[in-house]
A protein has these predicted regions:
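Helix-loop-helix connectors at the membrane interface of multi-pass transporters/channels
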Residues: 83-87, 93-101, 158-172
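Structural signature of transmembrane alpha-helix termini at the membrane-water interface
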Residues: 6-13, 31-42, 81, 108-115, ...
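Helix-boundary and loop/linker segments of multi-pass membrane transporters
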Residues: 49-57, 84, 130-137
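Hydrophobic alpha-helical transmembrane segments of multi-pass membrane proteins
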Residues: 2-6, 61-68, 143-157
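TM-loop-TM module centered on a large, flexible mid-protein loop between adjacent transmembrane helices
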Residues: 96-157, 172
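Membrane-interface loop-to-helix entry segments
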Residues: 1-40, 54-55, 95-100, 164
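Membrane-interface helix termini and inter-helical loops of multi-pass transporters
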Residues: 41-53, 119-129
C-alpha cells in the first residue's frame, strides 16, 4: 500500500506508467489461462440452464454484481479528466475501451472457468482451482502472480490515483 501511495504522491503520470506495466502482466496472466484452457473446454457445461445456473437466477444475479463492480472503474476515469490533455476525446475512449477489454477478458475467462472442470469441483472456489488443473506448474505460479497479484495491485494503485482527486479539487 505504501509503495502505491508514494507513487501517486509523485504524480499521476508516474502512477499511470506503473499501472500500464501492471496491466500488461495482468492481461498476460489471464491470456495464459485462456490460451491453455480454451481448447479444453467441455461445451456440454453450457447446454442446460441447470448446469449454468445450479442455484437458479440468484447466482446469475451475483455474477452481474461482480461484473458491475469489476468494470465500475471506468466511471472513476472521469475523476482524472483534469489531468488529461484532451479529456473530451480521451475520457470516452478510455471508458469504452477499458469496459470492452474487461468484457472480452471476463467472458473468455468465464468460459474457461465454467467449461474445464465439473461444477461440483469449482462451485464457490477461486479461479486457481481451474488454473491448477490445466496449467503446467511453472505457468501456474506465473498465472497466480500475473493475474492474482496484479489484479489486486492495479485495483489499489488506481484507487489511490482517483480517490484523492475530488478532495484536491475541493481544497483548491
Amino acid at each position: 500500500l505504501f509503495v502505491f501511495y508514494l507513487i501517486n504522491l509523485i504524480g499521476v503520470k508516474e502512477a499511470a506508467f506503473v499501472q500500464k506495466f501492471m496491466i500488461v502482466f495482468l492481461l498476460l496472466g489471464l491470456s495464459t489461462l485462456i490460451f491453455f484452457g480454451i481448447g479444453e473446454v467441455n461445451y456440454e457445461n453450457f447446454e442446460s440452464p441447470e448446469k449454468l445456473f445450479p442455484d437458479g437466477w440468484y447466482g446469475f444475479g451475483l455474477a452481474c454484481v461482480v461484473l458491475s463492480f469489476s468494470t465500475g472503474g471506468a466511471q472513476f476515469i472521469s475523476e482524472l479528466g483534469g489531468e488529461m490533455k484532451n479529456p473530451q476525446r480521451d475520457l470516452p475512449r478510455a471508458m469504452i475501451f477499458s469496459t470492452l477489454l474487461a468484457a472480452v477478458f471476463f467472458t473468455l475467462v468465464s468460459v474457461v472457468a465454467v467449461g474445464i472442470l465439473p461444477l461440483e469441483q469449482t462451485a464457490g472456489k477461486s479461479l486457481a482451482e481451474v488454473a491448477s488443473a490445466i496449467l503446467p506448474a511453472p505457468v501456474y505460479v506465473a498465472f497466480i502472480i500475473g493475474a492474482g497479484l496484479f489484479a489486486l495491485a492495479t485495483s489499489i494503485n488506481s484507487t489511490f490515483t482517483w480517490a484523492t482527486k475530488s478532495v484536491l479539487i475541493a481544497c483548491e
